[in-house]
């Protein structure tokens, strides 16, 4: 059968340390009292001579001043060995107490590791009023943190939905703009072909009229008229067609230039939607989303989401909320 020392090594070591504490302390304290007994008469004498030296005026009697200082120095020399011995004993007692404290901590760790002390005895009962209050406070803190996290999730989902709607609207506007450009190009190409056909028809009719006239004239007159008609009709026809085409091209170029200038002005006035990393920008501060944010309930709000510090709020508002720009539109 195992002995109690082997069954509970930690508790037995704790008991030994607690029994050794008063013995070691009393031994060293006794030595300190013996040292103080040696100085029981010297300390009052030293204090008396120091007070007398401080109260006396030594403006003229310097010899008395030197004599008193010598007496004080002699008493200090008598007390010095006792004071040094007292410091030595104190340092030894401190080291011994430090060793016993380390031994006690190690024994307690062994007792906890071997479950020598029951949990109820070590931590106390669980039905204490203070423990109930602690559990209630912890439940309130957890419920509050859960409510904040749910609000943050709602705001995040709402922000993602509004961002998706905005991207869909931008895609729809871009496709509409491309369709308008293609229609304009098609109209421009059709009008250009019509002008070329009309110019060609005029040229052919003129050629047929000149040919009919030259058939009735003499050969020399035919040759002369053919040369005059060729030199007269060709440059005018070419210049007319060129002028018409240049006019149409200039008009389309000018319209495109005006549209590009308008787009550049609009892009200069409008706020950037994303930063250099492609992240969307929100709020009056034109920054990315962070922390808790509140969404504007306005139908056509440009900024959409706002940081709580930027609008002067500490918590999320209840019900509908509108930004300053949307309030002006209401």
UniProtKB/Swiss-Prot annotation:
Changing residue 35 to V: In strain: SK1. The keyword Ligase does not apply. One of its GO terms (molecular function) is methylated histone binding. It holds the Pfam family ING. Residues 255-269 have a biased composition (Low complexity). Zn(2+) 1 binds at residues 283, 285, 307, 310. Its main location: nucleus. Zn(2+) 2 binds at residues 296, 301, 323, 326. InterPro entries: ING_fam, ING_N_histone-binding, Zinc_finger_PHD-type_CS, Znf_FYVE_PHD, Znf_PHD, Znf_PHD-finger, Znf_RING/FYVE/PHD. It is found in: Nucleus. Residues 139-272 are annotated as: Disordered. GO terms for cellular component: histone deacetylase complex; nucleus; Rpd3L complex; Rpd3L-Expanded complex. Changing residue 8 to L: In strain: SK1. Residues 231-254 have a biased composition (Polar residues). A zinc finger (PHD-type) spans 280-329. The PHD-type zinc finger mediates the binding to H3K4me3. Component of the RPD3C(L) histone deacetylase complex (HDAC) responsible for the deacetylation of lysine residues on the N-terminal part of the core histones (H2A, H2B, H3 and H4). Histone deacetylation gives a tag for epigenetic repression and plays an important role in transcriptional regulation, cell cycle progression and developmental events. Interacts with H3K4me3 and to a lesser extent with H3K4me2. Component of the RPD3C(L) complex composed of at least ASH1, CTI6, DEP1, PHO23, RPD3, RXT2, RXT3, SAP30, SDS3, SIN3, UME1 and UME6. This is Transcriptional regulatory protein PHO23. It comes from Saccharomyces cerevisiae (strain ATCC 204508 / S288c).
